[in-house]
């Protein structure tokens, strides 16, 4: 057993993606969440350290936590997740990240678009139309100050807090509620960033408009049992979705020949 855990997961960090300071800031955030009794899975401190090196690779060791994807068509499950997201954000709002980035246009749209074009990843027959669509989207999203960092005319009072950052259903594992510690637990905080609270909610929505509105209502019902939710942030859902699509396109392209 490692530090009392019968099974652990060793995570190796892709060289060059995160600095040691950024990784340690993620680990510190996970430790804050666990200290606040939020069911997040963070790295173990071995010999007083959470970040280790071997063969030129940085790695961490975390307890293995099993589970399945949550049933997001269950109102009780959504409310439960909403309550824990509020608690994550309560901790996240205590202080800002110093080293980790934000969910913004520069990181999630401009840089990925420029990279895809520079590396000729977009087929020539659609490149012009694709670039025009991206530029139009970026220009529209730039009107939201919460995502543009500067300028912007709408939502200028939106507060940016520390987030999980990649809160889609695959990063929430559910265990039976009749077992000790049952319910949701949150994994994979390595995309933790600063951003508006709604970033951690919108990726849990699926289905048609009516279904998504119902799911959102249940998430917010749970959320507001612990923390107020700013409904003005709902206007950011489509801009955030667009940023993710552009960013994810570059993420996939960069790993096209990756043996991992």
Predicted feature residues:
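Activation segment
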Residues: 15, 67, 184, 192-194, ...
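Hydrophobic alpha-helical segments that form the core
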Residues: 108-111, 240-250
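Active-site activation/catalytic loop segments of kinase-like enzymes and analogous catalytic loops
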Residues: 197-228, 244-259
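A glycine-centered beta->alpha junction motif in the catalytic cores
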Residues: 15, 58-72, 116-124, 245-259
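Active-site acidic catalytic loop and adjacent metal/ATP-binding pocket
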Residues: 1-10, 43, 145-201, 205
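A cross-family kinase active-site recognition segment
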Residues: 71-133, 158-160
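ATP-binding pocket architecture of kinase catalytic cores
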Residues: 3-99
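All-alpha amphipathic helical-bundle segments outside canonical DNA-binding/catalytic cores
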Residues: 100, 229-241
């Amino acid at each position: 057993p490692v530090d009392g855990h019968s099974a652990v997961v060793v995570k190796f960090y892709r060289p060059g993606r995160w600095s040691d300071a950024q990784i340690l800031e993620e680990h510190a955030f996970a430790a804050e969440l666990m200290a606040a009794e939020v069911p997040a899975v963070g790295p173990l401190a071995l010999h007083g350290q959470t970040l280790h090196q071997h063969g030129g690779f940085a790695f961490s060791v975390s307890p293995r936590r099993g589970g399945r994807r949550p049933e997001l068509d269950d109102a009780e499950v959504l409310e439960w997740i909403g309550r824990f997201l509020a608690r994550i954000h309560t901790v996240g709002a205590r202080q800002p990240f110093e080293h980790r980035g934000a969910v913004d246009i520069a990181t999630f749209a401009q840089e990925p678009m420029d990279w895809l074009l520079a590396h000729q990843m977009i087929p020539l027959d659609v490149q012009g139309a694709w670039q025009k669509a991206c530029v139009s989207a970026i220009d529209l999203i730039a009107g939201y100050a919460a995502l543009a960092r500067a300028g912007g005319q709408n939502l200028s009072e939106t507060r940016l807090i520390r987030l999980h950052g990649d809160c889609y259903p695959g990063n929430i594992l559910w265990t039976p509620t009749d077992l000790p510690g049952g319910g949701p637990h949150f994994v994979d905080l390595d995309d933790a960033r600063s951003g508006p609270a709604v970033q951690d909610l919108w990726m849990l929505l699926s289905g048609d408009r009516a279904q998504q509105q119902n799911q959102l209502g249940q998430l917010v019902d749970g959320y507001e049992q612990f923390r107020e939710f700013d409904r003005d942030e709902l206007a950011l859902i489509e801009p955030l979705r667009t940023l993710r699509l552009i960013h994810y396109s570059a993420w996939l392209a960069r790993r096209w020949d990756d043996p991992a």
